[in-house]
Amino acid sequence: MAPPSSSTQELTNLATTDWQYDGEEQQGHQSLPPADRGKAAYLFLAACFMLEALVWGFPFAFGVFNTHYAKLEPFASEGGIANIGTIQSGLMYFAAPFVSLALQRWPHYRRHAAGSGLVLMVAGLVAASFCNSVPALIATQGVMYALGGLVLYFPAMQLIGEWFVQRRGLAFGLVWAGTGVSGIVVPFLLQWLLDTYGFRTTLRVWSVILGIGAAPCVWWVRPRLPIGSANSFRPIEMGFMKKMQFWIFELGNVFQSLGFFLPTLYIPAFALSLGFPDFTGPLALALFNLAFCFGAVLIGTLVDRFHVTVAISVSTIGQMIAVFIFWGLSTSQIMLYFFALLFGCFGGGFSATWSGCVNALQRQEPSGHIDSGLIVSLMAAGKGIGAVISGPLSEWLLSIDTWQGHAGYAYGSGYGVLVVFTGVSATLGGTAWIGRLLSLL
C-alpha cells in the first residue's frame, strides 16, 4: 500500500476514489461527530497513521531479513529467500483491488475484517518464528502477513473520506507520512534484534509490537456516517481496457516495478559485499524510505501541473541517474547513500503518476466517465505482478553474473547484472513518454 510512502499512495487512492456523500443527508444527522475537526476525527487520523506505519514499515525493511536469512542455515542452502519479501509486497499490491471491492460490497464487516486481519498478521509472524524452511517462511511471513495486512489496512483507508472532507489532502499526507517514519526507524530496530537475538525472537517481538500498537487502532477506526449512507457496490464500466492508451500506461508501470523492489532487497547484502559496516544497509534503507515520501509529493505536484508523461519522464530520468551512476559506480558509503535517496525519491514517486494516468484516460473518453478507483487498482495490481516476478528473477540474474572481477566499480561486485537490470527496468518504465512522442497518448 507503501507509500509512502509511495509505497502506499496508490493503495490509499484506490480505497477512497469516487466516494461522494449527499449533503442533505449529512445535514439530517445532527448527532454525527464533525468532519475535519474534533477529538474523534483526530483520534481516527492518529489510528490511520499508526496502521500505516505498522503495516507497511515491516515489508519495506525486508532487506535486513534477506541478508540475515542468507547467512543462516537451513535457509541459505535452499535459495528462494528473496521470494519471501517480493511475494509479501506483491500480494499487498496485487490483492488490493479484491480486498477493497469486497469491503465496499459488505461495509458492515469492515471492523470485523480489520480485527481478523490483525489476528492473521500476528499469527503469520509467530508461525514464521517456528519455520525451518524457505517455503514455510513464504507461506507465513509472506502470504499470511500480506493478506492480514490488507484486511487490517483497507477499512481505515476507505473511511478517511468520511472524516476529512475539506482537509482531506492534508489528512492523507499525514497518514502517508507513517510509512516514511517507520522506514527510518524499523530497519535499525530489526537489524539490532536480528543481530542480538536471532530471527525467531525478532519475529515474536515484532508480533507483540504489532498487536499492541494496532489493537487500539482497530477500535478507533470507525465510520463517521451511518453505513447505509455510504456508496454501495455498483457495476463498473471497463471499456477503457480495450484502448491502447491504458495498456501503454500499464506496461510502463509493470516494467518499472520489475526493478523497483530489488534495491530494497539487496542493498544490505551489497553493502556487506563491499566491506561496508553493518549499519550501512539499514541506513541506506532508512534514507530510501525517507526520500520515498518526498518523491511522492514531487511527482504528484508535476502530475497536477503538466501532462502525466512529463512526470513519468522526470521519474524515469531520475531513476536512471540513480542506478547507472550512483549505484553502478558506487565504491563508497556516500555514493550508496546518494543512490538510496535518489532512487527512493524518483522510483518511489513513480506511483504518484497513477492519478495522472486516470486524468489522461478521462480526457480521451467522450463521456468523461471512467471509474478512477478501478484504474488505480489495476495499476496497483500491475505493480504487484512486477514485485512477485522480480524475486525469482533477481536470484537467477545473480546466478548468471559473470562480471565479478572483470568489470569496475559495482558492476564487478557480483551484483553488476542486477544493477543493469534495475536500470533497464526503470528506463522501460518511461514507455508512456515514448508513446506521447509517437502521438499515441
List where the protein language model places each region:
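C-terminal ends and interior cores of transmembrane alpha-helices
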Residues: 119-132, 218, 317-331
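Helix-to-loop junctions at the C-terminal end of transmembrane segments
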Residues: 94-109, 295-308, 326, 398
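Hydrophobic core of transmembrane alpha-helices in multi-pass small-molecule transporters
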Residues: 47-49, 53, 121-125, 134-151, ...
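Helix-loop-helix hairpin linking two adjacent transmembrane segments in secondary transporters
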Residues: 167-225
